[in-house]
């Protein structure tokens, strides 16, 4: 058990028969009445985000999530195959489970698979990935308004906004948290 006063971003808790990750939290001390903790939680099974308020000092269960280092091998229909790099054991995850992560996954990429009591919850990507641009419009000289961007498609099929100087064939570093351009790779 852990007190809600000890919440940290990224902490995994058990509440209402679900496994949740703390995305945001805020301690609130109103002038009148008891203090409370307002939090934003992501359900690790469904991906749903919920706002929940706890009384200060309330206890919740701490969920022990195991992260297994695995390598993404290939897609087989709507199943995606990952291999444990130590035991060579393979697991399959459905496209629905890793829909967001597929935008950044390429073959042979190392990721962490999140497991809770033997149940596979999902894939944890690195903070950034390096992907190659497969399609974008050429940047037009003189078209340099402050912060101008254009659409670019990378090798996984994901489309994002990039600065005008990015060309086809360039490698980009992309933030996997929000899918935004970081820099050229």
Swiss-Prot record:
CDD domains: S1_EF-P_repeat_1, S1_EF-P_repeat_2. One of its GO terms (molecular function) is translation elongation factor activity. InterPro entries: Elong-fact-P_C, NA-bd_OB-fold, Rib_uL2_dom2, Transl_elong_fac_P/YeiP, Transl_elong_KOW-like, Transl_elong_P/YeiP_cen, Transl_elong_P/YeiP_CS, Transl_elongation_fac_P. GO terms for cellular component: cytoplasm. One of its GO terms (biological process) is peptide biosynthetic process. The keyword Magnesium does not apply. Its main location: cytoplasm. The keyword Protein biosynthesis applies. Pfam families: EFP (PF01132), EFP_N (PF08207), Elong-fact-P_C (PF09285). Keywords: Cytoplasm, Elongation factor, Protein biosynthesis. It comes from the Bacteria. Pathway: Protein biosynthesis; polypeptide chain elongation. It is found in: Cytoplasm. Gene3D superfamilies: 2.30.30.30, Nucleic acid-binding proteins (2.40.50.140). Belongs to the elongation factor P family. Involved in peptide bond synthesis. Stimulates efficient translation and peptide-bond synthesis on native or reconstituted 70S ribosomes in vitro. Probably functions indirectly by altering the affinity of the ribosome for aminoacyl-tRNA, thus increasing their reactivity as acceptors for peptidyl transferase. This is Elongation factor P. It comes from Macrococcus caseolyticus (strain JCSC5402).
């Amino acid at each position: 058990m852990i007190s809600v006063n000890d919440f940290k971003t990224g902490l995994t808790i058990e509440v209402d028969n679900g496994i949740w990750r703390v995305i945001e939290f805020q301690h609130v001390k109103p002038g009148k009445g008891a203090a409370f903790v307002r939090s934003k939680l992501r359900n690790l099974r469904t991906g749903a985000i919920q706002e929940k308020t706890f009384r200060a000092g309330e206890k919740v269960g701490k969920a022990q999530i195991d992260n297994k280092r695995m390598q993404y091998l290939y897609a087989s229909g709507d199943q995606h195959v990952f291999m444990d790099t130590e035991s060579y054991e393979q697991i399959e995850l459905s496209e629905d489970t890793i829909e967001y992560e597929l935008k950044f996954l390429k073959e042979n990429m190392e990721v962490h698979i999140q497991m809770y009591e033997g149940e596979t919850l999902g894939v944890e990507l690195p903070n950034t990935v390096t992907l190659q641009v497969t399609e974008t419009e050429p940047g037009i000289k003189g078209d340099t308004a402050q912060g101008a961007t254009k659409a670019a498609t990378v090798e996984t099929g994901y489309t994002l906004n990039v600065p005008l100087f990015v060309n086809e064939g360039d490698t980009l570093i992309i933030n996997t948290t929000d899918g935004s351009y970081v820099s050229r790779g």
